[in-house]
Amino acid sequence: MYKSPNASSNLTSINGQSLPLRSWVTNFHLLLVVIDPFSHEGSWIINTASRVLSNFTGADCRVGWLVIGDAEQAATFLGPHSDEFITFIDPNGDFVKEVGLTQTPGIIHINQAPKLIAATQGWNPEEWKVIVSGLADHMQWSRPAIPAEGDPTPYQGSRIAGLEENDGEFSILGCGKCSVCRAGKPEKCEAVWVS
Protein backbone atom coordinates (compact mmCIF):
# COMPACT_ATOMS: atom_id res chain seq x y z
CA MET A 1 0.00 0.00 0.00
CA TYR A 2 1.28 3.45 -0.89
CA LYS A 3 1.71 6.00 1.88
CA SER A 4 2.93 9.54 2.38
CA PRO A 5 6.64 9.79 3.11
CA ASN A 6 7.90 11.50 6.24
CA ALA A 7 8.39 15.24 5.69
CA SER A 8 11.87 14.88 7.23
CA SER A 9 12.98 12.14 4.81
CA ASN A 10 15.92 13.35 2.76
CA LEU A 11 15.91 13.55 -1.00
CA THR A 12 19.32 13.94 -2.61
CA SER A 13 19.79 15.46 -6.05
CA ILE A 14 22.22 13.99 -8.56
CA ASN A 15 24.47 16.98 -7.77
CA GLY A 16 24.65 15.98 -4.11
CA GLN A 17 22.25 18.52 -2.61
CA SER A 18 20.41 16.70 0.17
CA LEU A 19 17.35 18.31 1.76
CA PRO A 20 14.34 17.07 3.69
CA LEU A 21 11.28 16.44 1.51
CA ARG A 22 9.48 19.41 3.09
CA SER A 23 12.18 21.72 1.65
CA TRP A 24 11.72 20.39 -1.90
CA VAL A 25 7.95 21.00 -1.78
CA THR A 26 7.81 24.33 0.07
CA ASN A 27 6.35 26.14 -2.95
CA PHE A 28 5.65 23.40 -5.46
CA HIS A 29 4.09 19.99 -5.86
CA LEU A 30 6.47 17.21 -6.87
CA LEU A 31 5.91 14.72 -9.71
CA LEU A 32 8.58 12.02 -9.86
CA VAL A 33 9.11 9.09 -12.18
CA VAL A 34 10.76 6.29 -10.23
CA ILE A 35 13.16 4.09 -12.17
CA ASP A 36 15.65 1.35 -11.46
CA PRO A 37 18.79 1.63 -13.60
CA PHE A 38 19.22 -2.14 -13.40
CA SER A 39 15.98 -3.05 -15.16
CA HIS A 40 14.89 -3.16 -18.77
CA GLU A 41 11.45 -1.93 -17.72
CA GLY A 42 12.96 1.33 -16.55
CA SER A 43 14.68 1.92 -19.87
CA TRP A 44 11.48 1.26 -21.82
CA ILE A 45 9.70 4.21 -20.19
CA ILE A 46 12.40 6.92 -20.32
CA ASN A 47 11.23 8.64 -23.52
CA THR A 48 7.55 8.45 -22.53
CA ALA A 49 8.26 9.72 -19.02
CA SER A 50 10.44 12.50 -20.38
CA ARG A 51 7.60 13.61 -22.66
CA VAL A 52 5.15 13.57 -19.72
CA LEU A 53 7.51 15.49 -17.43
CA SER A 54 8.27 18.04 -20.18
CA ASN A 55 4.59 18.92 -20.29
CA PHE A 56 4.83 20.35 -16.76
CA THR A 57 8.14 22.25 -16.93
CA GLY A 58 6.36 25.61 -17.06
CA ALA A 59 3.76 24.74 -14.41
CA ASP A 60 4.01 25.55 -10.70
CA CYS A 61 5.38 22.12 -9.83
CA ARG A 62 8.70 20.33 -9.77
CA VAL A 63 9.09 17.34 -12.05
CA GLY A 64 11.90 14.86 -12.23
CA TRP A 65 13.38 11.44 -11.80
CA LEU A 66 13.90 9.35 -8.69
CA VAL A 67 16.60 6.81 -9.54
CA ILE A 68 17.23 3.84 -7.28
CA GLY A 69 20.98 4.12 -7.59
CA ASP A 70 23.86 6.51 -7.09
CA ALA A 71 24.70 9.63 -9.09
CA GLU A 72 26.95 7.82 -11.56
CA GLN A 73 24.34 5.12 -12.22
CA ALA A 74 21.62 7.75 -12.66
CA ALA A 75 23.69 9.81 -15.10
CA THR A 76 24.70 6.74 -17.10
CA PHE A 77 21.19 5.30 -17.24
CA LEU A 78 19.34 8.53 -18.03
CA GLY A 79 22.00 10.09 -20.24
CA PRO A 80 20.94 13.61 -21.29
CA HIS A 81 17.54 13.15 -19.60
CA SER A 82 19.26 13.55 -16.21
CA ASP A 83 19.97 17.19 -17.10
CA GLU A 84 16.48 18.02 -18.41
CA PHE A 85 14.73 17.69 -15.05
CA ILE A 86 15.71 17.50 -11.42
CA THR A 87 17.13 14.05 -10.76
CA PHE A 88 17.08 12.55 -7.29
CA ILE A 89 19.09 9.51 -6.29
CA ASP A 90 17.99 6.89 -3.78
CA PRO A 91 20.94 4.46 -3.63
CA ASN A 92 19.45 2.21 -0.96
CA GLY A 93 15.82 2.59 -2.00
CA ASP A 94 14.92 4.17 1.35
CA PHE A 95 12.56 6.82 -0.03
CA VAL A 96 10.96 4.41 -2.50
CA LYS A 97 10.48 1.89 0.31
CA GLU A 98 8.86 4.57 2.47
CA VAL A 99 6.33 5.42 -0.26
CA GLY A 100 5.54 1.71 -0.67
CA LEU A 101 6.60 1.08 -4.25
CA THR A 102 7.86 -2.43 -4.93
CA GLN A 103 8.19 -2.21 -8.73
CA THR A 104 9.56 0.19 -11.29
CA PRO A 105 8.88 2.18 -13.25
CA GLY A 106 6.52 4.16 -11.09
CA ILE A 107 5.16 7.66 -10.83
CA ILE A 108 4.38 9.59 -7.64
CA HIS A 109 2.71 12.94 -6.99
CA ILE A 110 3.41 14.67 -3.67
CA ASN A 111 1.79 17.94 -2.64
CA GLN A 112 3.15 20.76 -0.47
CA ALA A 113 1.87 19.25 2.82
CA PRO A 114 3.88 16.98 1.91
CA LYS A 115 1.33 14.23 1.35
CA LEU A 116 1.30 11.55 -1.29
CA ILE A 117 -1.57 12.42 -3.64
CA ALA A 118 -1.19 9.50 -6.03
CA ALA A 119 1.21 6.74 -7.03
CA THR A 120 1.31 3.78 -9.34
CA GLN A 121 3.89 1.29 -10.47
CA GLY A 122 4.50 -0.45 -13.75
CA TRP A 123 3.43 1.14 -17.03
CA ASN A 124 -0.34 1.24 -17.11
CA PRO A 125 -1.16 4.24 -19.31
CA GLU A 126 -4.63 4.67 -17.80
CA GLU A 127 -3.24 4.85 -14.25
CA TRP A 128 -0.49 7.27 -15.27
CA LYS A 129 -3.10 9.35 -17.11
CA VAL A 130 -5.20 9.66 -13.94
CA ILE A 131 -2.18 10.83 -11.93
CA VAL A 132 -0.93 13.41 -14.43
CA SER A 133 -4.48 14.61 -15.17
CA GLY A 134 -4.97 15.21 -11.45
CA LEU A 135 -1.79 17.26 -11.34
CA ALA A 136 -2.79 19.15 -14.50
CA ASP A 137 -6.18 19.98 -12.99
CA HIS A 138 -4.59 21.19 -9.78
CA MET A 139 -2.03 23.28 -11.69
CA GLN A 140 -4.66 24.45 -14.20
CA TRP A 141 -2.28 23.18 -16.86
CA SER A 142 -2.56 21.22 -20.08
CA ARG A 143 -2.56 17.44 -19.98
CA PRO A 144 -0.06 15.36 -21.91
CA ALA A 145 -1.47 12.68 -24.21
CA ILE A 146 -1.27 9.31 -22.50
CA PRO A 147 -0.78 6.99 -24.23
CA ALA A 148 0.78 8.63 -27.26
CA GLU A 149 2.21 7.23 -30.46
CA GLY A 150 5.53 5.56 -29.73
CA ASP A 151 4.72 4.76 -26.09
CA PRO A 152 5.32 1.17 -25.01
CA THR A 153 2.40 -1.19 -24.58
CA PRO A 154 1.28 -1.62 -20.95
CA TYR A 155 3.54 -3.80 -18.84
CA GLN A 156 3.98 -4.79 -15.23
CA GLY A 157 6.97 -3.25 -13.54
CA SER A 158 10.01 -5.16 -12.45
CA ARG A 159 10.59 -5.90 -8.78
CA ILE A 160 12.95 -3.44 -7.26
CA ALA A 161 16.24 -5.23 -6.70
CA GLY A 162 16.73 -5.97 -3.03
CA LEU A 163 13.21 -5.10 -1.87
CA GLU A 164 11.40 -7.99 -0.32
CA GLU A 165 7.83 -7.95 0.97
CA ASN A 166 7.29 -9.30 4.47
CA ASP A 167 3.74 -9.21 5.91
CA GLY A 168 3.13 -5.78 4.43
CA GLU A 169 6.47 -4.47 5.67
CA PHE A 170 9.47 -4.16 3.41
CA SER A 171 13.04 -5.12 4.11
CA ILE A 172 16.04 -4.54 1.96
CA LEU A 173 18.33 -7.51 1.64
CA GLY A 174 21.62 -7.27 -0.18
CA CYS A 175 23.10 -4.29 -1.94
CA GLY A 176 20.55 -4.37 -4.78
CA LYS A 177 23.25 -3.53 -7.30
CA CYS A 178 25.53 -6.55 -7.72
CA SER A 179 24.86 -9.26 -10.28
CA VAL A 180 23.60 -11.63 -7.57
CA CYS A 181 20.99 -9.09 -6.37
CA ARG A 182 19.97 -8.19 -9.92
CA ALA A 183 19.47 -11.90 -10.59
CA GLY A 184 16.86 -11.93 -7.82
CA LYS A 185 18.95 -13.70 -5.17
CA PRO A 186 19.75 -10.92 -2.67
CA GLU A 187 20.10 -13.45 0.13
CA LYS A 188 23.35 -14.59 -1.57
CA CYS A 189 24.79 -11.06 -1.68
CA GLU A 190 28.00 -10.63 0.29
CA ALA A 191 26.73 -7.28 1.58
CA VAL A 192 23.51 -8.60 3.16
CA TRP A 193 21.82 -6.10 5.43
CA VAL A 194 18.33 -5.40 6.66
CA SER A 195 16.75 -2.06 7.44
Briefly describe each language-model feature range.
Residues 33-39, 68:
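Aromatic-flanked redox-active Cys/Sec active sites in thiol-based oxidoreductases
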Residues 58-74, 83-92:
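Thiol-based oxidoreductase modules, predominantly thioredoxin-like and allied folds used
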Residues 79-108:
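Short, internal strand/loop/helix patches
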Residues 1-30, 40, 44, 51-62, ...:
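Non-globular targeting/processing and membrane-anchoring segments
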Residues 70, 91-92, 113, 174, ...:
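A generic "binding-loop/recognition-motif" signal
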